[in-house]
């Protein structure tokens, strides 16, 4: 029997230590120990091994956080970064290249505007804005080089709402990634992937 996302999130927990803690502790460590130098060498040499080597790459506390959020968002997997803005910037830089075009809602967080208008142009990535109250105009902005459509819904701070299924239809028609900042709604209220989003971004300083 399949479990609801909420049940999966509750059941996901890092392997208990010999201290038999009830909740996952904070693993405040940069590195990890090994039984031998040979074991350490294998861990560093083989990326396929499911073992912690350095907290910048993986950490039990962070791993559980990722798994729980992914379960709540009905997502395949996730990545945790230091801040919400670093998550947004990392997403842009992962999926966009020189010459690409991104369509974005104009009603977005101020720092995201800064990335779109000041940083991405340095790498030859251009953007177009659309009005969330006039979604019928979005498709006219699509170009051959358009690779992504980005939106916050509800937007920060204006709480503008848009139909994600409508956006998903446009993106699938033109083979564009639909990226949704869901930090104001959280997966408790809205799960964008269920409505066709490809990627979901969060800031953990809002309601999570």
Give the positions of each predicted feature.
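Conserved PLP-enzyme active-site core in the AAT-like
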Residues: 9-14, 79-208
């Amino acid at each position: 029997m399949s479990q609801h996302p909420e049940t999966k999130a509750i059941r996901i927990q890092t392997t208990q230590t010999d201290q038999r803690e009830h909740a996952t502790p904070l693993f405040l460590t940069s590195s990890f120990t090994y039984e031998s130098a040979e074991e350490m060498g294998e861990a560093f040499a083989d990326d396929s091994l499911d073992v912690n080597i350095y907290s910048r790459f993986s950490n039990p506390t962070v791993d559980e956080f990722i798994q729980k959020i992914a379960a709540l968002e009905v997502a395949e997997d996730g990545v945790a970064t230091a801040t919400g803005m670093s998550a947004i910037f990392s997403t842009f830089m992962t999926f966009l290249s020189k010459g690409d075009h991104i369509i974005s809602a104009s009603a977005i967080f101020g720092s995201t505007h800064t990335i779109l208008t000041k940083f991405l142009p340095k790498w030859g990535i251009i953007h177009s804005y659309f009005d969330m109250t006039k979604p019928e105009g979005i498709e006219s902005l699509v170009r051959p080089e358009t690779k992504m459509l980005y939106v916050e819904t509800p937007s920060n701070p204006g709480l503008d709402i848009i139909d994600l299924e409508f956006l998903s239809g446009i993106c699938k028609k033109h083979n564009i990634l639909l990226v949704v900042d869901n930090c104001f709604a959280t997966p408790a209220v809205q799960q964008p992937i269920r409505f066709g989003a490809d990627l979901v971004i969060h800031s953990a300083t809002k309601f999570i």
